[in-house]
Amino acid sequence: MPTALCSIALALLVALHEGKSQAATTPIPEQPAPLPRARGSHLRTRRCSCSSWLDKECVYFCHLDIIWVNTPGQTAPYGLGNPPRRRRRSLPRRCECYSARDPACATFCHQRPWTDAVAVPGSGSPAAAFQDGKTQATAGELLQRLRVISATKIHFARQQQKPTRETRPTHSRQRKR
């Protein structure tokens, strides 16, 4: 029995050693050099810095070690630290890349205007559409549509709740007892 355990342990060590040597020969994508950190602090792995924390797509793209937790009201990011407000306000673009040689980051942050990602089709920006009152439907129309949808759902739910009774003949022998 001890020989079997020794051979399994030896095989595992050889496999780990082979994997380590292969990992050392594969090129690693460029990441920012780790800064000396204080004892107990956690260095966040980021590829860029978002100009707005409300832009969830940008936060998810830029912060590589973020943990997303599903909550009833929203998807809340954990593991974020707040950058200085001056820097956040001064960013004219969606985000700023830490490495100029990261093509995916450059495409995401600089070539695609982030206001167009949330814009109402056919308008310049969401704010302009609401200020001009040129939304696709007025508030009254939306309210009416919601009422119709709600009434339809209530009607459908009531139809589903009605028990289906089997029709019995009136001359059943069980009733005559």
Swiss-Prot record:
The record marks W68, V69 as: Cleavage. Residues 155-177 are annotated as: Disordered. It comes from Bos taurus (Bovine). Endothelins are endothelium-derived vasoconstrictor peptides. Disulfide bonds join C48-C62, C50-C58. The keyword Secreted applies. Expressed in various organs including heart, lung, liver, kidney, gastrointestinal tract, uterus and ovary, but not in spleen. Within the gastrointestinal tract, gene expression was detected in rumen, a ruminant-specific digestive organ, as well as stomach, duodenum and colon. Keywords: Cleavage on pair of basic residues, Disulfide bond, Secreted, Signal, Vasoactive, Vasoconstrictor. InterPro entries: Endothelin, Endothelin_toxin_CS, Endothln-like_toxin. Its main location: secreted. This is Endothelin-2. It is found in: Secreted.
